[in-house]
Amino acid sequence: MKKTFIILSLIFFTSANAAGHMSSKDKEATLACTGLYYANSMIPQGTLKLDKIVHSIASKKFLTSYLIKEGLKEDAINSKLNGFVDELYGKPYDDKKTSNCDKFIYKLIPESKVEIEKLVKSGIY
């Protein structure tokens, strides 16, 4: 009986962890990166290369959908993103922050780089 309980507990906790649920710290960092991508997407095209704007739009779209799948409410996401955009709007493109966000997201979310690249190539963002 004790052995069965331990085995079932291990299976439950392993599968719960394997489902990819994010910690609150990871959710906040992902929201911050999504806000950065959103603000980057509003930088005028003449100021920033089009490929960086398109990457930002696709990343924002992918991450917003991902956060909704993770259980965050769309209104809460939009509210947070608006706060980040208010803070970052009008500031120049920060290559270092954007690169750090890319690395963080690609490491945190399996296949995120591939999915974002698909969005970029599809032209649907």
Regions found by a protein language model. Give the residues of each.
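Compact alpha-helical subdomains of small soluble proteins
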Residues: 51-125
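Processing junctions and N-termini across compartments
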Residues: 12, 27, 94-95
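Short N-proximal segments of mature Sec-exported proteins
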Residues: 22-72
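Boundary at the C-terminal end of the N-terminal hydrophobic targeting segment
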Residues: 16-20
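Generic detector of short alpha-helix boundary/capping microenvironments
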Residues: 6, 21-22, 89
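Sec-dependent N-terminal signal peptides
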Residues: 4-15
